[in-house]
């Protein structure tokens, strides 16, 4: 069902400080810096051979900002999401739904490695 870990999401209070710290830890520059304006978040992405790490901070109002702020309030900076890849989205959706997980209808997309 799950074929890969697409990426990890780490909630951070200060995106600039976190970027500098993770730059030192990973020994590389980020490949992307941006915003999800509708979600109220800013992000920085570090790319690896088979996955990527997304630093995510609140910078406005929205569902993403609420997630980040809630996670930081509860646990401090840290892991808030593991995004999985699958070779069969319909099968994965059906299996997760069968086991009682609340899941949205699948939205196929092309990931950073050019796969769908």
Set out the residue ranges of the language-model regions.
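Vicinal oxygen chelate
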Residues: 4-13, 44-49, 54, 67-116
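Conserved short beta-strand elements that form part of the metal-binding/catalytic scaffold
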Residues: 29-71, 115-116
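Beta-hairpin (beta-strand-turn-beta-strand) motif
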Residues: 58, 85-87, 108
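Short, extreme N-terminal leader segments that mark the start of a protein/domain
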Residues: 1-33, 39
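Short acidic, gly/pro-rich beta-turn/loop elements at beta-sheet edges
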Residues: 20, 56, 65, 92-94
């Amino acid at each position: 069902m799950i074929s890969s870990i697409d990426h990890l999401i780490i909630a951070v209070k200060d995106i600039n400080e976190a970027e500098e710290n993770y730059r030192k830890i990973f020994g590389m520059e980020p490949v992307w810096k941006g915003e999800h304006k509708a979600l109220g978040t800013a992000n920085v992405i570090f790319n690896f051979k088979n996955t990527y790490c997304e630093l995510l901070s609140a910078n406005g109002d929205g569902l993403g900002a609420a997630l980040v702020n809630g996670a930081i309030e509860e646990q401090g900076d840290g892991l808030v999401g593991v995004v999985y890849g699958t070779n069969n989205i319909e099968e994965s959706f059906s299996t997760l739904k069968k086991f009682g997980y609340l899941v949205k209808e699948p939205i196929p997309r092309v990931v950073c490695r050019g796969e769908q």
